[in-house]
């Protein structure tokens, strides 16, 4: 998606970025960061398209301390990206350039944009689609942690989508190496995705610090957000939102959760553990039953004629299934006596009879509410199924109805 160009998006002059211009031709603006702009660019020799992140590091915009901080963070990001190069779900760094005034990072061009924008368009994702995205994300996080790298800024805005809707983790500006047993104390990241230990660490000088577990908390927030269309921790007053995070206060109360499985709710609860020691690791999360469900096989490569035949067979099969479902099957006396409530037609008669006797619906369980299914009483007595014998009544009496209902 092309963005409008403002004064802050002006391209560096040739002298300030000669090495970059010799190899790439910058095009339209496709994204912006706090201190950077992202443009589509074309490799002059091959014509291939990429994305370039351009950061201005001049004294006009930043103090000397800020200049050095930006340069150091970019160098660290470049080093980490080169270390993790080749992973299918991590953005690939193609080139990097540094001049006295600008820094350039050239990446693969992810045409589908951010996961955040995709979620905004869809409102909420299905469990199937969420499963695919979260599996890829956790595989990337597991790879980072295995290489002693913590991301520290996982969120939908930093997850990009390629042409095949596969994700790539990006924006490693807050990432750093973390040796086993080492702890961090720096407050960084996005408020709604911060783990409780990061907040506690910033408030308590005696706090031991935080580790890689903060990435798994963020994964839990992302998982919740994809399914609900809104984050688990939010309040218009940020101080109250941060308190909710530190106490782990969230609920599955919105209507979207009515159709979500208990399995995915369990995974969320295991990721959003306030105690980092009780939180799942990336490897443990990938072993959760939520990811064990069958994703389906790859589609066949069929010719147009074969696809047409499959479509015809599908329509014929659907018609036969519908016919079989609605065909009235013979009802035996033994089946009726064994479990009358298991038969739909008889069940309707029983429920309506109960309403006539008691004046209200008779529930068969605490979770059962059948009132919406039976809104009209029958116009007359219920016929007895099966042949009548001499002396039998042609209608069910009230005493017989009570006996059937037990």
From Swiss-Prot:
Result after altering residue 253 to G: No impact on phosphorylase b kinase activity
Positions of region (Calmodulin-binding (domain-N)): 306-330
Top-level EC class: transferase
Catalytic activity line of the entry: 2 ATP + phosphorylase b = 2 ADP + phosphorylase a
EC number: 2.7.11.19
Active site, per annotation: 153 (proton acceptor)
GO CC term, one of those recorded: cytoplasm
Residues where ATP binds: 30-38, 53
Keyword Phosphoprotein in annotation: yes
Domain named Protein kinase: residues: 24-291
CDD domains named among the record's database cross-references: STKc_PhKG2 (cd14181)
One Pfam family from the record: Pkinase
Effect upon mutating residue 233 to S: In GSD9C; decrease in phosphorylase b kinase activity
Keywords, sorted A to Z: ATP-binding, Calmodulin-binding, Carbohydrate metabolism, Disease variant, Glycogen metabolism, Glycogen storage disease, Kinase, Nucleotide-binding, Phosphoprotein, Serine/threonine-protein kinase, Transferase
Residue list for modification Phosphoserine: 345
Clinical disorder: Glycogen storage disease 9C: A metabolic disorder manifesting in infancy with hepatomegaly, growth retardation, hypotonia, liver dysfunction, and elevated plasma aminotransferases and lipids. These symptoms improve with age in most cases; however, some patients may develop hepatic fibrosis or cirrhosis.
Protein role: Catalytic subunit of the phosphorylase b kinase (PHK), which mediates the neural and hormonal regulation of glycogen breakdown (glycogenolysis) by phosphorylating and thereby activating glycogen phosphorylase. May regulate glycogeneolysis in the testis. In vitro, phosphorylates PYGM.
Family as reported in the entry's similarity comment: Belongs to the protein kinase superfamily. CAMK Ser/Thr protein kinase family.
Full protein name: Phosphorylase b kinase gamma catalytic chain, liver/testis isoform
Biological source species: Homo sapiens (Human)
The organism's taxonomic lineage, starting at the top: Eukaryota, Metazoa, Chordata, Craniata, Vertebrata
Gene assigned in the entry: PHKG2
């Amino acid at each position: 998606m092309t963005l409008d160009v403002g004064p802050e998006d002006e391209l560096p002059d040739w002298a300030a970025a000669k090495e970059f211009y010799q190899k790439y031709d910058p095009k339209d603006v496709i994204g912006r960061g706090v201190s950077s702009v992202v443009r589509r660019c074309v490799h002059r020799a091959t014509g291939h398209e990429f994305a370039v992140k351009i950061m201005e590091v001049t004294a006009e915009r930043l103090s000397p301390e800020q200049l050095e901080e930006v340069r150091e963070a970019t160098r660290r990001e470049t080093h980490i990206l080169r270390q993790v190069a080749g992973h299918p779900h991590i953005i690939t760094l193609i080139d990097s350039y540094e001049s006295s005034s600008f820094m350039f990072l050239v990446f693969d061009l992810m045409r589908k944009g951010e996961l955040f924008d995709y979620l905004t368009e869809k409102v909420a994702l299905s469990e199937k689609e969420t499963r695919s995205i979260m599996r890829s994300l956790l595989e990337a996080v597991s790879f980072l942690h295995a290489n002693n790298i913590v991301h520290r800024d996982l969120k939908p805005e930093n997850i990009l989508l390629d042409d095949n809707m596969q994700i790539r983790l990006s924006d490693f500006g807050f990432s750093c190496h973390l040796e086993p047993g080492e702890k961090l104390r720096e407050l960084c990241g996005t408020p709604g995705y911060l783990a409780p230990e990061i907040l506690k660490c910033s408030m308590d000088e005696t706090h031991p610090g935080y580790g890689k577990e903060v990435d798994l908390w963020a994964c839990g927030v992302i998982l919740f957000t994809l399914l609900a269309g809104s984050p688990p921790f939010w309040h218009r007053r940020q101080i109250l939102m941060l308190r909710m995070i530190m106490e782990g206060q969230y609920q599955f109360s919105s209507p979207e959760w009515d159709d979500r499985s208990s399995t995915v709710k369990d995974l969320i609860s295991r990721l959003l553990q306030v105690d980092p020691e009780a939180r799942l690791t990336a490897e443990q999360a990938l072993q959760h039953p939520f990811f064990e469900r069958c994703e389906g096989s790859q589609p066949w490569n069929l010719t147009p004629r074969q696809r047409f035949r499959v479509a015809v067979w599908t329509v014929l099969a659907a018609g036969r299934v519908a016919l079989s479902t609605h065909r009235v099957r013979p009802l035996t006396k033994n089946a009726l006596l064994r479990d009358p409530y298991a038969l739909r037609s008889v069940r309707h008669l029983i429920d309506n009879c109960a309403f006539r006797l008691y004046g209200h619906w008779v529930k068969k369980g605490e979770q059962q509410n059948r009132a919406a299914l039976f809104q009209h009483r029958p116009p007359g007595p219920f016929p007895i199924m099966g042949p009548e014998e001499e002396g039998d009544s042609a209608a069910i009496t009230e005493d017989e109805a009570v006996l059937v209902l037990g």
